[in-house]
Each structure stands twice: as structure tokens, then as C-alpha cells.
């Protein structure tokens, strides 16, 4: 038995003293996981989150400038000149407009604005406005200073309320030609008194007609006299209208009563984001590339999930919580069946720390110590592919589609519902496309890495040939001595197998001879043990018979 133990120890020592080279991957303590088409929560050495999820919670400037914050006013209150919005009359510039949900200063005198949503969209799409006078007071030969308690005993800054003067209201006929070289937004209104008495007190007659014409429009209006529900202390109403006077066009207004006449107009210039945010967010001293009603964000990632109403230089919105792209290897310490390529050779338990130059590499041990090096060729190819993957995803998702918070009036509620459903469906499709694209890329990445490690392992295996033996753990035990220079030739593909073939053959025969001697010794010991055991049993049985016969416990009869 002592001989057997000695041989076993010799074999272990022989194996442990062999020079060795292993193929492995960069070691990490990563807890990152990604999803693929076939697996969820696959551990990986490195992953990149493609989804931006944070915002600063503030209203910020964008590349187009600062926002116009209306505070207590609405956009229509600004356009028509609500007297409570006087601070905004000096003109302004904006990249987007902020309207507070609690804004109360809109149309102070009750009534409806025709095509209000289109007007708000037109105004907000510009980046600046300038107020200009189009019909001066001196053009009227009636009173032009009508006011209302509903408007703080004042009236709109962009229109004049024309009423009778000295119990007379002759036909008013005014013209304005746009020589400004830019389009002018102008507004007017028609008053609908609650009673005939109020009508005649204001305009001396009940049957009046107003016409407003340009090269593009030809509108005629008559008042609808009658009481309405009390709003802002008024039973009367004003219907509000607007139009755009293009350069060179002429506006003509004719009326013998009930006219709220144009006074000032707006020259709209430039182009903004065209967005109206209804939010109570505070304005911050910040500049962002992308703004939402929840806050601003800056990111280089291709996707975000902050708000579908984002605008600016924004990544694509997808309504998911995470989109992780695998940019490294499977972080699996033990060999197992993975991916499309089966068992992956070269995955060393725990990986190697220090292989910082890349994913794939070699570790060796010889008389000079232990060394480690990355395989720069395969690593660089992998890095190049990873670098291009994010760009490919961005390119594949670069079709521009912005969800705009469309405004519809109450009569268009059904249209609004349909629009929202369409927007939601499109967003769901984008999210599905993004997730599917990332799943496909992750599957491809991990399978490519599996193949790369396998190829590197097989490359070394082919180079070494019979000069080494696989240990089953991603390593090769060499039958010859291999210094650091020799190890480098294995790594860079210049290994000369014939140079070490004779030394390897002798070492292999030596090891195989030890194995044969060991096997012969085992056979001899086995035979000896069997014979000895049989003799001991036979002698024991004979002694038992002798003892039994001597004391009469056993008798032997021989019959002939």
C-alpha cells in the first residue's frame, strides 16, 4: 500500500509541476443581468443601460432659448390683451410657453373664441411676438372707449369696443394694408347684448350688420340678442374671432353696431418648439437638451421614460422601466451549456482579476512564475462591435415621432379620445420595437462572445497539438518546458510545435510509463491480496474443524 500511495503522490506532483496555459475572460464582481430572446436575467460581466429615467424637476432653457411663463394669464388672455396681463404686452421671445393650471386671466368678458386651439397652436409655434397698431382710434367717429366690470372696469388691449356717440352710430368703414413684410395676427369680436334695451342703448338700433374682409376671408355677422346665464356678472356675450393678414393684403371692416374692432395686432416671428406646458414647475437656472412637463433632462442615451410629451433634442420615449444592453461576456464561472455554441471552453472559475486590457485573454504558469495577457485581436474586434451596437440601435430607432398634447374643444372630445388612443398605440409599438431590438442584440452579443472564447480555445488547441493535454477546465498542461517567450508564441499564433515535439514525446512517454508501472503494481498487489486472503480463510476453516472434532462437537464418518 505504501508503494501505491507513493505512485499517486508522484502523479499529482508531476501534473502540478507541468507548465500550463489557460484561456479565460475578464473577471468582474458584476451583478448585472440582461434579457435575451431565450433567457431572462442572464448574468453578464458588463451591461449598459440604454434608458434614461431621471429629470431635474424644473423648467429650463433649451437650445432655442428660455420659456415664456404666463403665470396668471392664459395664451388667449395674452393675445387679446386681458388688462390683467399688461406685463406681457411688451412682446417677448420663447422656446416654449408655460401656462399655469391655475391661470384665471383669459377672456375676461364671457364668450367663445372661434378656433381657439388653432390660435394657441399658431401663437406658440412662433418664437417671438411684437404688438403693432393696425386701426388707430382716430379712424372711428363713434365712441371707442367701451369698458366692462368683467374686465376690471377696463377692456382688452388689442381691441376697441365701439358704441354710439351722441345717440348716433353711423356706418364705420376702416381699412388697413399690411406693408410690414410679415404676417399680422389680428382679432375682433361681436357683442351680443342680453336685451333689446341694452342693444339700443349701445348701438341705437337692433338690426345691425358687421363685415370683416381680406383677400382670404369674407365674414358677415349679426347680433343674437337675448339673456344668457350670468358669468362674471354679465348676461351678454362676445364672440371672439381672429385671422392672419398676409403681407400686401388689406383688411376692411364695415359695421353699424355690435363691433369689437381690431386695434393692435401681433407680428409673429421665428420658430419655437411649439409646445405649451401646463405645469406648476418652478423655473430653474438651467439649460437642457430635452424638456418635459415633469422636468428637464440631459442624456446621451437613446431612450428615456420620463414623459411621452418630451420635446427638444430628446431620445426616443419608451414606456418601460429598463433597457439593458449586454456589452460583455456571460458572467458564468463554471462551464455549462450556453447559447448556440454549447459548452464554452475557457471559462475559469471566478475569472481573473487584472485582465484589464480586454475581455478575452490568457493566464500561464511556468518556472518564471504566473503571467496574464489579453488577446488584443479578438478583444478589439469585440470592442468595435460593441461600440457600433448602440449606434445601430439609435439608427434603427431614429424615425422621428413626437407625441404632442393636442388641444381639442369640448365638441371634439371624441376626436381627442381617438387621438390619445392612437398616440398610446404608437408609443406601445415603439416600446415593443425597442425591447425586441435590445433582446436581439443581447442574444447576438452573448452568442458572439461564446463563439469568440471557443474560437480562441480551439486556436490554442490546434497550435499545441500533441504537445499538451486538456485538463477539462479551459487549460492546457504542456508536455515541455515553456518560458515566457514560449508562452507569448502560443498567444500570438507563432508557436513552433515541431521545436518542442521531441521533448513533449519523451515527457508524454515518461508519464505514460509511470501510469503503466502503476497499473502493473496494482495488478500484482491485487493478485497477492486475493491469494493471501484465500489462504487465511482456508487455514481458519481447518483450525475450526480440528477444534470441533477434538472436543466431540463435530464427527466425521467415512462410508465405503
Question: What are the language-model segments listed below?
Answer:
Residues 2-560:
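Extracellular/luminal domains of secretory-pathway glycoproteins
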